[in-house]
């Protein structure tokens, strides 16, 4: 991982959190429970009140539905929350989707690329130039896809 990578997100070679470094463990837990702070400190993102409410609702709820008009910042927020989840939950798989592949690539992943490129620190990982995929390690990844057939969504 690159220089400047947040110490709270560094992991040892055995893919296990180094529990001997308790302050970093506490810091990781802090960011897991504070997406608004993570977005501000690491991505430089300022949210408006409703976006903060949506972001914090992910802490306690498995499913969050957002009903809103066009242009309200849902895609902007979803992209940054995907990065928050990925980088605060090591060795996770973050799946992003939208109703069409065009929306995945041209909207959601465009926002992910912007947030990743403009992060205040080097987040690490390998953001593929054309594909909707950000790989941090072999089994630590964020990918985007869509399908017209619900059976394929597995």
Q: Which positions does each model-derived feature cover?
A:
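Phosphate/NTP-binding elements of NTP-utilizing enzymes
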Residues: 1-154
């Amino acid at each position: 991982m690159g220089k400047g990578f947040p110490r709270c997100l560094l992991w040892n070679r055995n893919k296990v959190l180094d529990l001997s470094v308790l302050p970093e463990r506490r810091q990781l837990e802090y960011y897991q429970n504070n997406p608004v702070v993570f977005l501000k400190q690491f991505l430089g993102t300022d949210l408006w009140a409703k976006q903060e409410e949506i972001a914090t609702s992910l802490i306690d709820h498995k499913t969050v539905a957002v009903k809103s008009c066009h242009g309200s910042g849902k895609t902007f927020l979803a992209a940054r929350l995907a990065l928050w989840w990925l980088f605060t939950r090591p060795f996770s798989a973050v799946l992003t989707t939208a109703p069409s592949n065009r929306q995945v690539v041209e909207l959601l992943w465009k926002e992910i690329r912007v947030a990743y490129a403009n992060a205040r620190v080097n987040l690490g990982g390998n953001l593929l130039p054309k594909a909707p995929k950000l790989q941090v390690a072999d089994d630590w990844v964020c990918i985007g896809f869509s399908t017209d057939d619900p059976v394929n969504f597995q």
